[in-house]
Amino acid sequence: MDRGSLLPFQLWCPRPFSKYSQNQPRPPSATLKPPVCPDTSSGTEPDHRPAHLESTPPALAAEAPTSQHAPLLSTAASGDEGRVLLDTWYVIKPGNTKEKVAFFVAHQCGGGSRASSMKVKGHWGSDSSKAKRRRRCLEPTKAPPDQGGQEGTPATEVAPTSSGDDVDLLSVAEMVALVEQRAALALQSYPRPSTPAPVVFVSAEQGGPAKGLGSERRSGGGDCSRVAEAVAHFEAQRDSPPTKGLRKEERPGPGPGEVRIAFRISNVREPQSPDGSLANGGGGRPACPYPGSPGPGTRAKDKITCDLYQLISPSRDALPSNVEFLLARADEASEGETPAPARPEDTPPAPPPPPARDCGASGFHVDVVVTGVVDACIFFGKDGTKNVKEETVCLTVSPEEPPPPGQLFFLQSRGPEGPPEPPPADTASKVPGPEDSEGTTDTSLCRLYRHVSHDFLEIRFKIQRLLEPRQYMLLLPEHVLVKIFSFLPTRALAALKCTCHHFKGIIEAFGVRATDSRWSRDPLYRDDPCKQCRKRYEKGDVSLCRWHPKPYHHDLPYGRSYWMCCRRADRETPGCRLGLHDNNWVLPCNGVGGGRAGREEGR
């Protein structure tokens, strides 16, 4: 169908507003992978795109076969009349009438019968008044995104299967996971899996645990599965679905010089195994140098500080080289298995089954493992060997003698407010057995929490106490404080009055005078204050009294003098503005009040 066969009014009439809006936000399910230009070798193109996307044509064009737009779409997609095949992302800046558009041309898929990606004229009838360069090509092979209505979809249907076309179409998180997977496989000499792309793991079903991670994908709502869909769990490519009970699998040793950083938030309502063992490869670590790591008899009851403690005290013989991300909620079923226990450092466990995730008040379980080449000697100066006792720098001094200056924060507190005493060396170095698993785990968790967070707070508090001024002056009697204040200048007294109410009361009650005070001690000034500001001298007065000349005079033995609030030379000095008063009897030549006093004398 050529352009001349279209009706004239179709060239100028825009599409109805009730069909779809051009500036609608993208749905949450379409945020992972941008649409790309598919291979349109055939002339028929079933349109699977949702009708509410911002770059899709009206729904009537793809559904009604009797419409005029349907043949236009099919013929344009086949490349007969030069449809724009650019995969463009555009940004409409608000406030502009012409809608300035920024174009980002994405990857152009190859095809024998595809038209060139040059800028060509589009069809008025296909997309009506939509901008031509903003169009995207149809996607016949791309299935609509799963909205959470299906359960048990195989991962091979949703995960990428071809490495040539889909590797560059992954999201950023999936690309990073794919690179990490290939690097880990190269280091560990693993055989490459059949599917090079990582399998996306989503757990959003309300029910029992999944049967396997590599054979089942469960997608739920956008808010619950958006984070889990952004990362990959590559161990499911190699491992079979784990069964219930204890599973320990020997794997190749990790590469040297890598430290696992594991942050763990476990559910408080995790069930305990009947035999007291960990599920899914969570076996205890022999000769663990830190007491917080789970033993063969401990259950996954560890808090977030347990795996954080593994970060600050690593070991050279047990450093994993894989990258894993797991987002799941703790399994509440009483089936005797604990999902994703604390990972021992010697053998990375098998991937735990994805239990049902509840976004409500039941809590969730997050286990993030990141690898990085870090020397073990960085943390606490350890050499990374086994059976190392956890110690902190402390000086043992008798409580009778005062603490040495500058070393207050190194001392071990003896009072009840101090930290608890560290357990003996054998408790810190041995692995808790099945018989004393509960008590040892609780004690070690408390000690881990104190070691990780409380030690830092304690040292910081001691440093603050060391650097803060001592409050000895508040304990001194008042007559001693008055004697001390009498040796201070006006600035120091003013600062004390502004900072401490107790000092202010003492200065005003006892009339403490500064050493550089310029208040006149003559009683005439108290009886005859400044006529302009009505300021009288009071006890401990450090308030402002600006230069206010007084025309009143007083006959002194050395001549007639005039009452001045401040000396003329000190009027503009900062001291006068801060309350350094100069109320002296001065000669007429030294003050500005001489002329005014002469005029008042003639009256």
Swiss-Prot record:
The modification Phosphoserine is found at S21, S67. PROSITE patterns: FBOX. Residues 347-356 have a biased composition (Pro residues). Pathway: Protein modification; protein ubiquitination. SUPFAM superfamilies: F-box domain. This is F-box only protein 46. Residues 470-522 form the F-box domain. Part of a SCF (SKP1-cullin-F-box) protein ligase complex SCF(FBXO46) composed of CUL1, SKP1, RBX1 and FBXO46. The keyword Magnesium does not apply. One of its GO terms (biological process) is SCF-dependent proteasomal ubiquitin-dependent protein catabolic process. GO terms for cellular component: SCF ubiquitin ligase complex. One of its GO terms (molecular function) is ubiquitin-like ligase-substrate adaptor activity. The modification Phosphothreonine is found at T347. It comes from the Eukaryota. Pfam families: F-box-like. Keywords: Phosphoprotein, Ubl conjugation, Ubl conjugation pathway. InterPro entries: F-box-like_dom_sf (IPR036047), F-box_dom (IPR001810), FBXO34/46 (IPR039594).
